[in-house]
Every structure is written in C-alpha cells, then in structure tokens.
C-alpha cells in the first residue's frame, strides 16, 4: 500500500516507477522472450460472453487520425478472434473512463493516471494487462514542458507569470505528474500562484498546437525521451506530430523533464472471462514480431514490444489521484 510516508520518499527524489523488478514470485512475460507465436484465427469459447470486442481510444489527437492508426489493428483483432470489433474514440480521457464504468468497452490503452482513475471509478473493476516497452527495453517515459523556440523562455524560472496548458485532467504526463513534481519543487500550480494562468489544451496534440499558435506560453506532453530529438524522439506525442507534419522540433524548446513515469497499461474489465484476458495478452505479446507495421502504427513509434504488469504496479498513481482529489475538495 502506498502511504503518505512513501509519497514523502518519492518527493525526496525517488523515481515515478514502481519496483516491478523486486517481485519475488512472478516473472512478467515480455515480447522479447515470448515464444508461443501469434494466436491462430478462430472464434473462441469466451465469445458467447463477449460477442463483440469494443476498443476504447483515448483522446489526445483528432478522431480521424486515431481511427486511421487503429484501422488495421481493429481488422486484425476481428480476424483473429472471430467477433465483430469496433473502435470507440473518446473526445477526452474521461470518455474512456466513463465507458469502462458503463461497461461499454472491453479494452483500452490507458495512461497510468487514466488507469488509476478507471480503477477508482469502477471500485477495482478494471485491471492492467501489459505496458509498452521502449527502444531500450525500459517501461517508462517522460513528461516534458515545451515552449516556442522563439519565446525567449529557456528555463522554469522564466515561466513565472507565463501561461501553461495542461493536456488532460486524466493524463499522467499531461497533468498529474507535472503538477505533483512542480509542487514538490515549491512551484504553485494553481492559476496566479506561479503561472499567470493555466488551462486545458484539449489533449496532448492540441496543447502543443496551442503553444505553436501562441495561445499559451508552454504546455506539458509526453515523450519516450529516447532516440533522435529532431524527429520528436522514438515514441510519443511529439513523434506523432512530427510524422504528421504538424511540428518541426526546431520550433519548440524543452525546458523541463520529469522523472521516469511508468508507461500506461492496456486495461480491461475484471468481469470478463479469464480466457479472454489471456488471449488479449497473447495477441499483443506476439504482435510486434508478427505484425510490426501494425504495432508501430498503434504505438506511434517503436520499441521492443510489451511486458505484463499487475495492479500493484500502479498503486502509486491511485494514491496520487486520491491526493489530487482531496486537494481539489480543499480548494472548493
């Protein structure tokens, strides 16, 4: 259980990653060592209980791009498991959380904070299946604060009195972790405390666009922090924007980076058959080697594949969500 003492330890400089490697009795499966091969096509016994597969897509980029990226993935799921498969793009992160609560979706790739929110909203009715690994095999990414390169802002001190866009209230990298980290550094995150104003950009892509269009002085978003910075790194929102022609990295400056954050999981409902959840795991563990183009599309870049996780790996984010909710109640 994450306690206030453990949060204090984190505030003293510990990483934002759980100690997955310390597990004594469980070895997570990884794509790199997964030898079972890609699942053979065919309708499964669990299909009587799961007659359709509904996949939630988090907000953060425009709907047409999301549907385009996941089109081949949807077709592969449908072909493999023999059940109609539909994509449900939400306008924001909250839409996916609400869909889980209403049992309107079976699976969704979530950020760590969004998973924690879904777990709280459903009273433990969702569980994580796996997370993406980065190019070096790690399972973390970074939150970064970006400004326009021509803004004259080169560090956090120069953000005093400037405006800041959060990405989404249910995003770890675009809200929860930067707020926690900035408060830890003695920087007030409420409007008028340090920044002249703060607001929500409407998603990661939209928040960066708002900076480029001078609607905000800075925004927070996510990146792997690995690979060629000129290309937006190896994976993340900046990578995707560069690939879509929406961003030239020369137009941005990164002025702040978080500590490593655990990658968000693929989440599913706990009331679904165990065989279904296992098949979804096996499908994804084998996907990067069997269908590398589809894997790179849905991950907005590449890595070494996927790794199994458990709920306990995300307990820190559950506690941070509770702390944030308590702080919000105190403000009101």
Segment roles from a protein language model:
Residues 37-116:
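Extracytoplasmic small-molecule ligand-binding "clamshell" domains
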Residues 58, 128-144, 201, 236-278, ...:
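Periplasmic-binding protein-like
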Residues 98-158:
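Acidic, polar ligand-binding/catalytic clefts
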Residues 165, 169-273:
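Pocket-lining segment of extracytoplasmic ligand-binding domains
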Residues 6-25:
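N-terminal export signals
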Residues 24-72, 268-332:
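An extracytoplasmic/periplasmic, membrane-proximal ligand-sensing/linker region
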Residues 54, 59, 91-93, 104-122, ...:
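Beta->alpha turn/N-cap motifs
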Residues 55-80, 113, 138-208, 213, ...:
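Bilobed "Venus flytrap"/periplasmic-binding protein-like clamshell domains
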């Amino acid at each position: 259980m994450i306690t206030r003492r453990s949060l204090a330890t984190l505030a003293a400089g510990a990483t934002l990653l759980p100690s997955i490697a310390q597990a004594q009795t469980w070895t997570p499966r990884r794509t790199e060592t997964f030898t079972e091969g890609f699942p053979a096509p065919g309708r499964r016994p669990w299909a009587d209980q799961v007659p359709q597969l509904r996949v939630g897509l988090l907000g953060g980029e425009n709907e047409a791009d999301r549907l385009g990226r996941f089109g081949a993935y949807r077709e592969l799921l449908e072909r493999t498991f023999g059940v109609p498969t539909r994509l449900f793009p939400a306008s924001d992160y909250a839409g996916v959380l609400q869909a889980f609560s209403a049992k309107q979706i079976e699976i969704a790739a979530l950020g760590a904070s969004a998973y924690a929110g879904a777990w709280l909203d459903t009273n433990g009715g969702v569980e994580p299946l796996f997370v993406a690994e980065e190019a070096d095999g790690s399972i973390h990414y970074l939150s970064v604060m970006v400004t326009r390169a021509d803004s004259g802002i080169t560090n956090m001190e120069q953000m005093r009195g400037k405006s800041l866009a959060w990405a989404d209230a249910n995003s770890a990298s675009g809200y929860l972790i930067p707020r926690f980290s900035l408060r830890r550094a003695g920087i007030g995150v409420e409007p008028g405390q340090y920044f002249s104003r703060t607001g929500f950009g409407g998603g990661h892509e939209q928040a960066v666009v708002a900076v480029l269009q001078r609607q905000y002085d800075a925004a927070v978003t996510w990146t792997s922090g690995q690979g060629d910075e000129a290309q937006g790194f190896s994976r993340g929102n900046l990578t995707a924007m560069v690939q879509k022609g929406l961003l030239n990295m020369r137009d941005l400056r990164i002025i702040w980076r978080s500590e490593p954050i655990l990658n968000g999981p693929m989440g599913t409902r706990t009331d679904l058959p165990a065989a279904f959840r296992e098949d979804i795991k096996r499908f994804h563990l084998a996907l990067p080697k069997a269908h590398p183009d589809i894997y790179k599309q849905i991950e907005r870049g590449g890595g070494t594949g996927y790794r199994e996780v458990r709920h306990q790996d995300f307990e820190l984010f559950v506690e941070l969500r509770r702390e944030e909710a308590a702080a919000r109640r105190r403000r009101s």
